[in-house]
Swiss-Prot record:
Name of the gene this protein is made from: ipi1
InterPro entries hit by this protein: Phage_T4_IpI (IPR024373), Phage_T4_IpI_C_sf (IPR038569)
Transmembrane annotation, as ranges: none
Disulfide bonds: none
MF annotations from Gene Ontology: type IV site-specific deoxyribonuclease activity
Name by which UniProt lists this protein: Internal protein I
Function summary: Internal protein I is one of four proteins in a complex that functions in bacteriophage head maturation.
Annotated site residue numbers, Cleavage: 19-20
Length: 95
C-alpha cells in the first residue's frame, strides 16, 4: 500500500485536448464512412440526421437548410470551400 506522500507525488500525464486532436479523433473514428451517419466519440453510435463528408466535416439538415460544419462542433465560425464530391454526398443523402 502506498503512503499518502507516495500517492500524491505520482502524477499521471494528461494530454491537452486541442481542436486539432479532437478533429483527428473524429477523422479516425469515421474513416471510410463518407456518405454515412457520423460516429459519436461519446458513445460510439451513429448520430442520426448527420452525414460525414470526410476530412473532419459533417452535414445535417436543419429544417429547409443544410448545415455544413466541422465535425467536432466547435463554437468558432469557420469557412471552408467544399469539393464537388462533398456536394454529391449531400445531394444523395440529405436532399
Amino acid at each position: 500500500m502506498k503512503t499518502f506522500k507516495e500517492f500524491t507525488s505520482t502524477t499521471t500525464p494528461v494530454s491537452t485536448i486541442t481542436e486539432a486532436t479532437l478533429t483527428s479523433e473524429v477523422i479516425k473514428a469515421n474513416k471510410g464512412r463518407e456518405g454515412k451517419p457520423m460516429i459519436s466519440l461519446v458513445d460510439g453510435e451513429e448520430i442520426k440526421g448527420t452525414v460525414y463528408l470526410g476530412d473532419g466535416w459533417s452535414a445535417k439538415k436543419d429544417g429547409a437548410t443544410i448545415v455544413i460544419s466541422p465535425a467536432e462542433e466547435t463554437a468558432l465560425f469557420k469557412a471552408k470551400h467544399i469539393s464537388a464530391a462533398h456536394l454529391k454526398i449531400i445531394a444523395k443523402n440529405l436532399l
